[in-house]
Amino acid sequence: MKSEAKDGEEESLQTAFKKLRVDASGSIISLSVGEGPSVRASARTAADDTKPKTMCASKDSWHGSTRKSSRGAVRTQRRRRSKSPVLHPPKFIHCSTTAPPSSSQLKHRSQTEPPDGISGRGISTPKEFNAGENSTSLDVNHTGAAIEPLRSSVLRLPSESKTEELSDATQVSQESLTANDLSDFQSVSKLSQGKPCVCVGKECQCKRWHDMEVYSFSGLQNVPPLAPERRSLEDYSQSLHTRTLSGSPRSCSEQARVYVDDVTIEDLAGYMEYYLYIPKKMSHMAEMMYT
């Protein structure tokens, strides 16, 4: 009998806890409950202060697991598991030596640029163009450097056309105010837009065109020398050619063979090896696919 009564009491307590909402502070708010056992349970919990705090402090802390009130509001950054580096977009640092049109249109410094005029790549840039005097002096130095090779090229020419060339040189010096530097191809081509080259019809004495390397090809410098078989094939084709000049006309196949000897299949295979390197594994896989 006692055990049955205890079971009944436990059931009534459970139903009471289901129908009661208990705050974290321990104050009990009874929902509209008309049953007898629930009222009795609320009276019992009010009388016994120690039980409700341990058993039903709040809905979040049932089963001993404390749950955060704001679930998705503050979420900490999870540590990256992958070993690949985090790639950030590149930060461009613009540095040029030409003067800005006015002091109001100053260039905004990028945040990554260090304070003492040294850009991220280690190139020392001019401090900053706040004062117009610094920039103008820089520009004057540039134009002086630009005019010197021009004058040297002008002085070499014959004396008849000297006055004409001096006027050309002054015009070019005015244009070189806009050009950054004579070392790059674009600025030199801008310089020569005004008038045609002074030395048209004579030997070109414009020094800066000869010193400039517009395009540099690196791929064709490492070509292997001709194989000995190729040389022997060339000799063979020449002997065939001389033989046919004296003797009977050749057949079509012979003519074609002489023509092909110029660029042999071995050369083409070497070209494939050197320039279109196809890995062995890949070609094997391709063979397996297509057979």
Swiss-Prot record:
Protein origin, superkingdom: Eukaryota
Alphabetical list of InterPro entries matching this protein: DUF776
UniProt keyword list: Phosphoprotein
Keyword Phosphoprotein: yes
Compositionally biased intervals (Polar residues): 95-105
Residues modified to Phosphothreonine: 143
UniProt-listed Pfam families: DUF776
Span list, region Disordered: 29-139
Biased composition (Basic residues): 65-83
A cellular component term, taken from the record's GO annotations: nucleus
Protein name: Oxidative stress-responsive serine-rich protein 1
Species the sequence originates in: Mus musculus (Mouse)
Lineage of the organism: Eukaryota, Metazoa, Chordata, Craniata, Vertebrata
Gene: Oser1
